[in-house]
Amino acid sequence: MPMIPYSGGSSLEANFAAPYGGMSIDFAYMDQIVALHEDDMDVVVQPSLQWMHLNDKIKETGLFFPVDPGPSAKIGGMVGTSCSGTNAVRYGTMKEWVVNLTVVLADGTVIKTKKIPRKSSAGYNLTGLFVGSEGTLGIVTEITLKLAVIPQETTVAVVTFPTIRDAASAAAQIMRIGVPVGAMEIMDEVQMNVVNRAGTTGKTWKEMPTMFFKFSGTKAGVQDNISVVRSITKAHCGGDFDFAKDAREAKVLWSARKEALWSMLSLKEEGQEVWSTDVAVPLSRLPDIIEISKKEMDDLGLFASILGHVGDGNFHESVLYDNTNPKERAAVEKCLHDMVDRALEMDGTCTVRSRASPTHKLQANRYRENTGLGWARRSPF
């Protein structure tokens, strides 16, 4: 009988679904910090601890956990899906921040995947094997995470562009030059309209393709990075930078990005659904795929938007459609599947942040043909 570990159920791609039935193992009450080692810059936690709660509890130490998916995500699910968030362009994804796991195997054996030291060449990389395995190899009951130092200076800036291609091209050049931005996000004019209609940010936004930047580090370093990014965005037809003057303004400016999905969901009417999925491509192909996908989405004649973590070539499409209308649903499905096929043709991947969902099955099979996923299915692990 399949045993499905469940920590928060916040996945947007239904990763906790049980298509073949089974038993749910609920970790709801395992939500504590087991041990905090400030000098070692690591923390031991249970799987149902929310990452934002973790950061609230340790902020007085000057440390934080930098992986930032949706606010409701919990550490167990983050490990299972090898998730990421807006900070990935600087800090990487979940797999870079997991030191050790306590895992219960199918036969009841309890193992630890690694000792605490950050570097080790002894044996297989078992931690890396379990991160992203979605509970298929064992049930994770305890996690040791690396922590980072809270940057001395953090600020946020927002800049608009006339087209989504201009914004994507600017993002690709910023990464190619090597500017260490803290985060770099993109939202199209439809998504900016959604945020305005939801009215949850306390600000009225220009309804144009928009990029959101975080800059963090030393004061001098932040100013240098801002100067370089400003010149690049200007060269790609970017408008004026809207800078945060203080922490309150930074929170307001960044809120549009964090509220993006929930703003779209708030527009749902009876019978409507939001279909959202993501892809990633090499940075050099990002402007092409975003431009083509945007046109095809607009041709649907539905409420459809693009947002994404363009610093690592990753973006999402979200479409609001009538689920009771078979023709409308079929058109949306074709549009999103075409986007995924296009990404695969560009040497990209069919899913990035949330692992492969039921909607990715056909594309995942294509992806498997040319990667090690086929071997993974046949492997003894």
Descriptions of predicted regions:
Residues V149, V158-T160, A168-D338, R342, ...:
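C-terminal substrate-recognition/cap domain of FAD-linked oxidoreductases
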Residues T109, A356-F381:
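Activity-critical C-terminal alpha-helical subdomain
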Residues M1-M30, P47, H309-V310, A343, ...:
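Glycine-rich N-terminal segment of FAD-binding domains in flavoprotein oxidoreductases
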Residues E38-M41, A157, V274, T324-K327, ...:
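Short beta-alpha connecting loops at secondary-structure transitions
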Residues L12-F16, M23-F27, T136-T144, K219-V229, ...:
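Short, acidic (Asp/Glu-rich) active-site segment that either coordinates a divalent metal cofactor
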Residues Q32-E185:
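FAD-binding subdomain of flavoenzyme oxidoreductases
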Residues S7-S10, G70, I116, I186-E189, ...:
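Short, ordered loop/turn segments at secondary-structure junctions
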